[in-house]
């Protein structure tokens, strides 16, 4: 499993990084592959984001940003974790509540 460290201080930086990483896994064009996201809430407070990339032939890859843990976990279409990004600097999960 590939583990790296990145500084992604804003939510937009985080989205862009996840989109590029998921597309690179299956050699997809980010301009042609939409990224969907959903808010993860724990005890009524936002704590992360769930990302899903839909590719050709019903291909779906996923990423989970665990805001409190400052890391992003990446999963392939079979559910196998293939990478992790640890954030040296990341957005505040509470920003998503606004």
Language-model regions, residue ranges each:
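Negatively charged, low-complexity tracts enriched in Asp/Glu with abundant Ser/Thr
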Residues: 1-49
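Surface-exposed beta-strand edges and flanking loops
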Residues: 5-7, 53, 74-76
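Proline-rich intrinsically disordered, low-complexity coils
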Residues: 9, 46, 56, 91-93
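Generic hydrophobic secondary-structure signal
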Residues: 14, 18, 22, 50-51, ...
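General "foldedness" signal
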Residues: 25-28, 32, 36, 63-65, ...
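Amphipathic, interaction-prone secondary-structure segments
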Residues: 35-71
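A short, surface-exposed interaction/processing loop segment used at functional sites
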Residues: 69-98
């Amino acid at each position: 499993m590939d583990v790296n460290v990145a500084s992604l201080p804003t939510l937009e930086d985080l989205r862009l990084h996840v989109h590029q990483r998921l597309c690179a896994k299956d050699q997809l064009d980010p301009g042609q592959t939409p990224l969907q996201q959903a808010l993860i809430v724990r005890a009524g407070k936002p704590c992360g984001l769930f990302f899903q990339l839909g590719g050709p032939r019903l291909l779906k890859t996923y990423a989970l940003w665990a805001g409190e843990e400052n890391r992003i976990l990446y999963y392939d279409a079979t559910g196998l974790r293939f990478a992790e990004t640890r954030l040296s600097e990341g957005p505040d999960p509470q920003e998503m509540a606004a």
